[in-house]
Regions:
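Conserved phosphate-binding/catalytic region of the ribokinase-like
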Residues: 3-5, 206-313
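Active-site metal-binding loops of divalent metal-dependent hydrolases
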Residues: 10, 135, 266
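Hydrophobic anchor at the start of a short beta-strand
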Residues: 49-50, 76, 158-160, 224
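Conserved N-terminal subdomain of the carbohydrate kinase-like
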Residues: 49-132
Length: 313
């Protein structure tokens, strides 16, 4: 029985074949994607299979994603198929080693139509960890569903982990910072990168955990994980955290990166795997999470086979 539930989007990424702009690209490579999907797959690869609540269309792209998740060891109990909506698509541009840019086709697609209550209370009673991201908050149906899930998980003393992932192109007129503020009181731990924090209303030096963590603690989470790319990652927790008040930093690992897409998701999976496994030293948690993230970058694709994280240490 899984002790972790991950919830959110899965989609198909299309990457240009060759170094050409999207407007002039004739051929694309198809890959499975979506931050929560990447987290669920990485957890399975770390021998901690998680339930994954998502929704894809009853179309060939949905078939591709459902088959990929199953092949990667993700239990299919909460992988829903929508007969009335298509699967989300994203076209990726930019340098994969420095950070991708996305053009989304997501209006009314299946993952925006998550419905409250589809994960029953008995499933939440069975898990100890719930991981959600911010992308579902951009769409009204999914927003209600994720809020409901987080509130019920919080009421059952599950540890709720929130991946703060700013995608301005998805939000339109919806208030990103406001939606983040609404969900944070029910969140225990938040993971973010500096570029996510400004749009979420965090002020000051967003590369400095001592500057950003107090602002996030005030909003609810007792633990903050800040990823810093090649510089590593930092963490800070208050006395309300099960691991006590602490600060930690780890400088990361130098690897020959092929593709950094999904590195942050691998980091999240590493954090959850370490904490769910009983680790309470945040320095050790960061060491493990950075190793998982580094290992994930040496092969192309956010769901590619994961080398042994110990191999990069």
């Amino acid at each position: 029985m899984p002790d972790v539930l991950v919830a959110g989007e899965t989609l198909v990424d299309f990457l240009p074949e060759g170094d050409t702009p999207l407007a002039t690209t004739d051929a694309f490579a198809r890959r499975p994607g979506g931050a929560p999907a990447n987290v669920a797959v990485r957890l399975a690869q770390l021998d901690r299979p998680a339930w994954f609540w998502t929704r894809v269309g009853s179309d060939p792209f949905g078939d591709f994603l459902a088959e990929t998740l199953a092949d990667r060891g993700v239990p299919d109990r909460f992988v829903e198929r929508d007969p009335s909506a298509k699967t989300t698509l994203a076209f990726v541009s930019g340098d994969p080693t420095s950070g991708p840019r996305f053009t989304f086709y997501r209006d009314g697609t299946a993952d925006t139509r998550l419905e409250p209550g589809r994960v029953p209370d008995d499933a939440l009673d069975a898990v100890e960890w719930v991981v959600v991201g911010s992308v579902p908050l951009a769409s009204a149906p999914a927003r209600r569903a994720v809020r409901d899930l987080v509130d019920r998980a919080n009421a059952r003393d599950c540890t709720v982990v929130f991946d703060l992932n700013a995608r301005p192109e998805l939000w339109g007129d919806t208030d990103f910072a406001g939606e983040v503020d609404r969900i944070l009181p029910a969140v225990d731990a938040v993971k973010a990168s500096p570029e996510d924090l400004g749009p979420a209303g965090i002020e000051g030096d967003t590369d400095d955990v001592d500057a950003v963590a107090p602002q996030l603690h005030e909003r609810g989470p007792h633990t903050v994980f800040l990823t810093l790319g090649e510089a590593g990652a930092a963490a800070r927790a208050t006395a309300d955290a099960p691991w006590g008040p602490t600060e930690a930093f780890h400088g990361g690992y130098a690897v020959d990166a092929v593709d950094t897409t999904g590195a942050g998701d691998a980091f999240t999976a590493g954090v959850v795997d370490a904490l769910a496994g009983g680790e309470r030293d945040l320095s050790a948690v960061l060491e493990r999470a950075n190793a998982v993230a580094a290992a994930a970058t040496v092969r192309a694709g956010g769901m590619a086979d994961l080398p042994d994280p110990d191999s990069v240490v």
